[in-house]
Swiss-Prot record:
Keywords: Amino-acid biosynthesis, Branched-chain amino acid biosynthesis, Leucine biosynthesis, Lyase. This is 3-isopropylmalate dehydratase small subunit. It catalyses: (2R,3S)-3-isopropylmalate = (2S)-2-isopropylmalate. The keyword Lyase applies. Heterodimer of LeuC and LeuD. Its EC number is 4.2.1.33. PANTHER family: 3-ISOPROPYLMALATE DEHYDRATASE SMALL SUBUNIT (PTHR43345:SF5), 3-ISOPROPYLMALATE DEHYDRATASE SMALL SUBUNIT 2-RELATED-RELATED (PTHR43345). One of its GO terms (cellular component) is 3-isopropylmalate dehydratase complex. Catalyzes the isomerization between 2-isopropylmalate and 3-isopropylmalate, via the formation of 2-isopropylmaleate. The gene is leuD. Pfam families: Aconitase_C (PF00694). Gene3D superfamilies: Aconitase, domain 4. Pathway: Amino-acid biosynthesis; L-leucine biosynthesis; L-leucine from 3-methyl-2-oxobutanoate: step 2/4.
Length: 190
């Protein structure tokens, strides 16, 4: 009963953005939070860094560079997703095309928002992130908790609850429905 697309192994193109303390307002400025659905936020992700004042692409912003176009794995700095607890930041990154974000650390709420939106947040040390950023593509194996370049693998930690949800494609509703018979039994006992 998968409610979201399961993540087991994933191979994707990377883009490095090694800034520390990227907050949710930098990910999706509050001026763009007027939508009522989860989609349509991608064009506004990193809006103030991504575009020049005239609206054209900023050629110095890594995700705009030709070698990083189509990247689905973001490798970034420490304390990613800090600031206000807007879930729109996760929606914007997902809508932009990211499936995996590798950082030195995450805001707790942002980390949870990623997992709730079928994105895998991975915490790795700086030397591992710098090594992985040298490659065009890397591979993530969630069941074995590894991130691999062609020549090296790095182990990462993830809470078993989040891992189970992502590997099995379960959102909160799907998890609740797994206990439907127990819930009904309890309700009848009242």
């Amino acid at each position: 009963m998968a409610a979201i697309k399961p993540i087991t192994t994933y191979k994707g193109k990377i883009v490095p953005l090694f800034n520390d303390n990227i907050d949710t307002d930098q990910i999706i400025p509050k001026v763009h939070l007027k939508r009522i659905s989860k989609s349509g936020f991608g064009p506004f992700a990193f809006d103030e860094w991504r575009y020049l004042p005239d609206g054209s692409d900023n050629p110095d912003f890594n995700p705009n560079k030709p070698q990083y176009k189509g990247a689905s794995i973001l490798i970034t700095g420490d304390n990613f997703g800090c600031g206000s607890s807007r879930e729109h930041a996760a929606w914007a990154l997902k809508d932009y095309g990211f499936h995996i974000i590798i950082a030195g650390s995450f805001s707790d709420i942002f980390y949870m928002n990623c997992t709730k939106n079928a994105m895998l947040p991975i915490v790795l040390e700086k030397n591992a992130r710098e090594h992985l950023a040298k490659y065009v593509e890397i591979e993530v194996d969630l069941p074995n908790q590894t991130v691999s370049s062609p020549d090296k693998s790095f182990h990462f930690e993830i809470d078993e609850t989040w891992k189970n949800k992502l590997v099995n494609g379960l959102d909160d509703i799907a998890i609740t429905l797994q206990y439907e018979s127990l819930i009904e039994k309890y309700e009848k006992s009242l």
